[in-house]
């Protein structure tokens, strides 16, 4: 029995050694270590390494993982994607394959927050504001073509605008010169009857030269909807209007000067026309008189009769409203000579149709404005009233206007006040 027990123990030990042959630490003490035991455990087959359960085998065994690890993207990349601009995202989406586009677009939309949307809106608003400012600067920089920052296209636009402005100025200057030359060939004809037309007027002036054109002015249409041009063509004139004016343009300047002979002639009963050059204004001021406080319904014939005694009258003009044709209450009388003007000034405060007239010399508006603007001219025309050089004293001697003497007199008065204290001292001494 004892032998059988010993054999059983030996068998158990051998079985344990067969199950764990590599485990030199557990099964055998450190004195039983054999050379090459570690190397043999390292270079053994897979089935031996998997089957071993000892400590040494577990340390040096390299077991392959049965499940492969799942690779998760780094969180930094997601942060960069959120901070990218819309343009970079669009370019990256174009480069990606078509199969991956829809899934990633959905992710990008989900990742955008409200704050990011607000930032994008602000950036777009700032970009639009910058564009508007650039447009305004381009319009305002007409004189800054020489700057290096200006683009070539902008310079071309500015040059074109300057060229148009210069061309318009040249056209205006040319038109002014043409009008000036045309005015020298033009004759003003006033106080024409309403029934007068172009044929009658041309036949009246045809003996002096060829007529280029005839224009009627100071027409008042019968209806408010009609223009003056249509009223002149259709002859639909206001019934209260009795006279009109016209301009006759000759082809030669000599013909216009000869046509002045018709000034004062009667073209119809009660209508004495006045003829004058359109360019002549200076000589008219010296021979004309301003008449104010006129009745509103007065006619030229009544004013002419009132000033007949002063001399031969060349023309009478009443200033009327352009829309209604009613007189504004003042007018002008043009005489043949300047001597008649002195006689007409004596008719100041004379009555006409129950109104006292105000008669004055006719003054050029430009000269009158210059006198008002220059105070020196006013002082020259009006001498000071305070200085009378011919005034005399009661003794008959002229007064001395030397300012220094007056100042000395004032000083002597002050000295006299001081002297007034001296006799008091003398009285005390006495």
UniProtKB/Swiss-Prot annotation:
Residue positions, PTM N6-acetyllysine: 151
Biased composition (Basic and acidic residues): 23-34, 113-123
Modified residues (Phosphoserine): 14, 28, 99, 288
Region Disordered: start-end pairs: 1-55, 72-123, 134-153, 365-395, 411-430
Keyword Acetylation among record annotations: yes
Subcellular location: Nucleus, Nucleolus
Residue ranges of every copy of the RRM domain listed in the record: 185-280, 287-364
GO cellular component: chromosome; nucleolus; nucleoplasm
Glycyl lysine isopeptide (Lys-Gly) (interchain with G-Cter in SUMO2) cross-link site: 242
An annotated Gene Ontology molecular function: RNA binding
This protein's UniProt keywords: Acetylation, Isopeptide bond, Nucleus, Phosphoprotein, Repeat, RNA-binding, Ubl conjugation
Gene Ontology biological process terms from the UniProt entry: maturation of LSU-rRNA from tricistronic rRNA transcript (SSU-rRNA, 5.8S rRNA, LSU-rRNA)
Keyword Repeat among record annotations: yes
A Pfam family this chain is assigned to: RRM_1
Family according to the record: Belongs to the RRM RBM34 family.
Protein name per the record: RNA-binding protein 34
